[in-house]
A protein has these predicted regions:
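Short, structured active-site "lid" loops
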Residues: 1-8
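RNA substrate-binding interface of SAM-dependent RNA methyltransferases
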Residues: 3, 17-112
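Structured loop/turn residues at secondary-structure junctions
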Residues: 7, 59-60, 130, 151
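Glycine-rich nucleotide phosphate-binding loop and flanking beta-alpha elements
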Residues: 8-10, 36, 62, 109-111, ...
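N-terminal accessory regions of nucleic-acid-interacting proteins
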Residues: 11-16
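Structured adenosyl-cofactor binding patch, chiefly the S-adenosyl-L-methionine
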Residues: 48, 67-75, 136-177
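Active-site/ligand-binding-proximal alpha/beta "capping" segment
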Residues: 103-154, 158
């Protein structure tokens, strides 16, 4: 049996280096997603879609526990995992230094159907917490908000499912499938 050494948990400085290496990066940010199963599923999908990094706040978020790694099914070894002190400040920094567009997923009066949003170039897709969605401070950093149109009576998805759908649309537009 071969032992796989997991990637270390990275921080804000590592994110700056990553953006220099991948100027058109596709990133996934999770705003206070606390369930390690959801974190693992998001990481697995991010790895499958070629996302360069998953960004989470250091506090009030799930961390890369053995459960999250197991659910990620190898994805935690493929995609960078970055814990930041302040997610809103990190998003503002990305916008200022690398012209990364921040696209939040939420249902509000300004939100576009996800397929109408341009995901080309450097982009970070931000998913909100399982029960409360995006915090107002995180919303304030979003250049655009999008929603996933649904035809059923239930207008809610699990965060990992919604992340998968958002990442698929981004990759479809970026011709990276």
């Amino acid at each position: 049996v071969a032992a796989v050494r997991p990637h270390p948990v990275l921080n804000e400085q590592d994110l700056d280096q990553l953006m220099q290496q991948f100027p058109d990066a596709l990133l996934l940010a999770l705003d206070q997603v606390t369930d390690p199963h959801n974190l693992g599923a998001c990481i697995r999908t991010a790895a499958a879609m070629g996302v360069q990094a998953v960004i989470v706040p250091r506090d009030r978020s799930a961390s890369l526990t053995p459960t999250a790694r197991k659910v990620a099914a190898g994805g935690a070894e493929k995609v960078k995992f970055i814990q930041v002190t302040n997610l809103a400040r990190t998003l503002a920094h990305l916008k200022e230094t690398t012209h990364t567009r921040v696209i939040g997923t939420m249902l509000d009066e300004k939100a576009l159907p996800i397929h109408q949003c341009d995901f080309k170039g450097p982009v970070v897709i931000v998913m909100g917490a399982e029960d409360t969605g995006l915090r107002p401070i995180t919303q304030s950093q979003c250049d655009h908000t999008v929603y996933i149109p649904m035809s059923g009576d239930l207008q809610s998805l699990n965060v990992s499912v919604a992340a998968g759908m958002a990442l698929y649309e981004a990759c479809r537009q970026r011709n990276s499938l």
